[in-house]
């Protein structure tokens, strides 16, 4: 007898080996119809897989996260089925599940077009309507090779070569189409009805730009239509908020092909940059950091000492002068150690906190570049704290408080916290790691926040805290970090005089709150949909005259506002006032002031707030107080 224990601890007995689907059928026909797969003793298996021993079983349905992932993976296979029917000479490569969807990489003689994508989606729906079973066959390695060789699937053969130890592999048959996968997959195409192909892109075999280019078809799949509709709505909203689109519409920045991955900031974009940088400079000042500035080009000997030259050189921009090799710095840490060791330091000097708006360069692949979010040249709010082991806890508590204030001021209210602990390969004693891990976790506990632990994900030189933001669309952005480092200061000869007149290497805490300013500004643009709060807005108020007779008064209003340190745009163009109001409203300005004869004579302004709110007439003094208060309150 085979005894199956279900999640509620009830048991069912069967006279012999039994499939997951048969167990589901014994429970009820409704569950059987919903069965996507099973989890046997914690391992996912196909619904057709047979259980031949006493086991715990969970039936997986589309309502389970695992079920949804299986549906997405099977929909990727369905893409392959449709593509091979429509384009028989196409070579299928790989089709994994990604967050909220899937993609399939395909080798074909020409790029796919939007019309091709529509045809593929239509064929997929025709295949789903046939309601066919997906058949799994565990197949000996030699036979797998013959199957793909006979079909001319060169990439599948290369993938088989990558798995020399696999003597049998799962082949999944969609009618005449066959694909290779560890599985599990859905038992029938009826589970695949709620899907949509979303976009086309280029890709490279094995993600290497030196290899052949492939076509990538992206898609999404869900358990029900409501979920799909919500997803499409989120994507459409994300497209409206795309920082690349808004950056152009609001005249903030552009990226030119002469400088891929490096940003050209326009006047309004640079005003936004300055608002962020000056705010962060104030944070440095208020929390005991000394602002420093290091060189951008450093000799290769330094990078050899840090290990970057040996392990990171492909990601660095290098140059040569007078028979010496140099690199543009990809990070600021070594420079801060050199500043630290430029003088004899005492334990009384610790903790010593340096902060820099350090410009870094990394040679990112061109295919990975994305607007100002993923660039080659970027500036970080990079800070390093040199301290003793006993000071780690207090510094982490103080840093977390800083970070929470900064994120709240920028409009982010939800933060996720993660602690990455010691990996197998590491420097430092277990006692030192115990102390450091306790310090970073206790710092978060004292901050009153929940956190998750990611075992083994710390760097070899110390544990770290990762701070992840959620934006207005619920997307997650890993921004802040607090990285404990037992290694770099020692490696570069940084030391201080101890209380007993000995010498010791300081612990180095790497910290960034916004990280890359370029990326953070991209996040701000998308989070606020371009309608930045008044304190950040590149132009906080526009002053418009109705006719030429109020030009001088409008100019004096603008001057008064500028004298208060406000960012003002004066528009004296000879255009209809309705046109001028619309023009500046589309720029998402916090305020528009209109002045006509009535306002001029009263020394007043007619105020319109963002969102087409007519606040009526008020004295210029009252408006100045209002806007200055908005800025002070970070509104």
Curated annotation (Swiss-Prot):
Protein name: Threonine--tRNA ligase
The protein's required cofactors: Zn(2+)
BP term (GO), one: threonyl-tRNA aminoacylation
Gene3D superfamilies reported in the protein's UniProt record: 3.10.20.30, 3.30.54.20, Anticodon-binding domain, Bira Bifunctional Protein, Domain 2, Threonyl-trna Synthetase, Chain A, domain 2
Cellular component annotations (GO), alphabetically ordered: cytosol
Residues covered by region (Catalytic): 242-533
CDD domains to which the protein is assigned, alphabetical: TGS_ThrRS (cd01667), ThrRS_anticodon (cd00860), ThrRS_core (cd00771)
Catalysed conversion reaction: tRNA(Thr) + L-threonine + ATP = L-threonyl-tRNA(Thr) + AMP + diphosphate + H(+)
Keywords assigned: Aminoacyl-tRNA synthetase, ATP-binding, Cytoplasm, Ligase, Metal-binding, Nucleotide-binding, Protein biosynthesis, RNA-binding, tRNA-binding, Zinc
Cofactor: binding details: Binds 1 zinc ion per subunit.
InterPro entries to which the protein is assigned, alphabetical: aa-tRNA-synt_IIb, aa-tRNA-synth_II, aa-tRNA-synth_II/BPL/LPL, Anticodon-bd, Anticodon-bd_dom_sf, Beta-grasp_dom_sf, TGS, TGS-like
Entries under Pfam families matching the protein: HGTP_anticodon, TGS, tRNA-synt_2b, tRNA_SAD
NCBIfam families in the record: thrS
Molecular function as annotated in GO: ATP binding; metal ion binding; threonine-tRNA ligase activity; tRNA binding
Subunit structure: Homodimer.
Family: Belongs to the class-II aminoacyl-tRNA synthetase family.
E.C. designation(s): 6.1.1.3
